[in-house]
Amino acid sequence: MSTNEAAASQEDIALAQGAVLVKSCQVPDGSIPIRGFDFSTASGPDFSLSAILSSYMSTGFQATHLAQAIQQVNQMLSLRDTPLTCDDDEKLFPYPEGRQKRSCTIFLGYTSNLVTSGLREVLRYCVQRNLVDCIVTSAGGIEEDLIKCLKPSYLGTFTMDGAKLRSNGMNRAGNVLIPNDNYCAFEDWLMPILDECLVEQEEKHLNWTPSKLIQRLGERIGDESSILYWAAKHRIPVFCPALTDGSLGDMLYFHSVKSSPGLRVDIVEDVRHINTIAVKSFKTGSIILGGGVVKHHINNANLMRNGADHTVYINTGQEFDGSDSGAQPDEAVSWGKVKPSAGAVKVHAEATLVFPLLVAETFAKHEGHKD
């Protein structure tokens, strides 16, 4: 190699090193080193789920987001348990109506497919233990909870032939199968209740809303496996702005054909109710599983108070199509639906995978400490 070639080579190396080995700045104080759960140091074969989940904060990626979500929910619960500091007049004006006023109102939202799945039992636990204050779901989140009290759904696969299932009277939701007979049983149970509601509308001038109708259905189902049973028992309002978008809507349609005048369901009274809940709350926390109308209805109610104080999203939606379903929490901050100080977090995951883990480290542990 010539002297010129050697000099050029050294210059190239120096240039490459300067590009590759850029000097690092000082790591900020409090930075968390990345480290996952070490099974080799676990104490015996009976290490706890809690020990694994406690390592998630330093694991990175969505494990860290789940750990942050757990922190957020525990902050909601801690704040909710804080004694109220307000005058007696304010305490006499509680929201939601018929419930004890809390220092933090927890909104829980979930899409219908999650009630179709076994996540129904996890959701029911939170409602049964009276740990949330306001629920928003879609029509399937109402009907699937009630139908499962009448007849079960079954495990299938994602790849089952649709035409064959149709000819056999089986409906597929992901890898869950719902026989058509389930909806027949639902119709037989529901129609007499709708008849009663119509009589009350005409004779007592009762103005039905989705939440009032859902409260009635929860009272009538009489089954402790039901989310709505416990919501009715604890007077937790369940809002469903898209009540007609599902089998429940089919039944309302069938009922309207045979009834004149028909049953009327007022969504305006309900939007006033949920917005007033948000406005009259001292602090609010939102836990939203999935997207669509469920996510936006909770966020928009919190806009009326200039944003939720704590927010957790769990969904698989992406923001690149401009949808509200996939939007990050910071987009909601721009609209005033989440406070900038909320420490909001989105867990990019399918809710049946991670919500039971979150409940284990938050709601269940909270109740365990009380017991």
From Swiss-Prot:
Its EC number is 2.5.1.46. Spermidine binds at residues 143-144, 250, 296, 322-324, 331-337. Its cofactor is NAD(+). Pathway: Protein modification; eIF5A hypusination. NAD(+) binds at residues 112-116, 138-140, 144, 245, 291, 316-317, 350-351. One of its GO terms (molecular function) is deoxyhypusine synthase activity. GO terms for biological process: spermidine metabolic process. It is an enzyme of class 2 (transferase). Coiled coil: none annotated. Keywords: Hypusine biosynthesis, NAD, Transferase. The keyword NAD applies. GO terms for cellular component: cytoplasm. The active site is at 337 (nucleophile). The keyword Cell inner membrane does not apply. It holds the Pfam family DS. SUPFAM superfamilies: DHS-like NAD/FAD-binding domain. Catalyzes the NAD-dependent oxidative cleavage of spermidine and the subsequent transfer of the butylamine moiety of spermidine to the epsilon-amino group of a critical lysine residue of the eIF-5A precursor protein to form the intermediate deoxyhypusine residue. This is the first step of the post-translational modification of that lysine into an unusual amino acid residue named hypusine. Hypusination is unique to mature eIF-5A factor and is essential for its function. Belongs to the deoxyhypusine synthase family. This is Deoxyhypusine synthase. The lineage of its organism: Eukaryota, Metazoa, Ecdysozoa, Nematoda, Chromadorea.
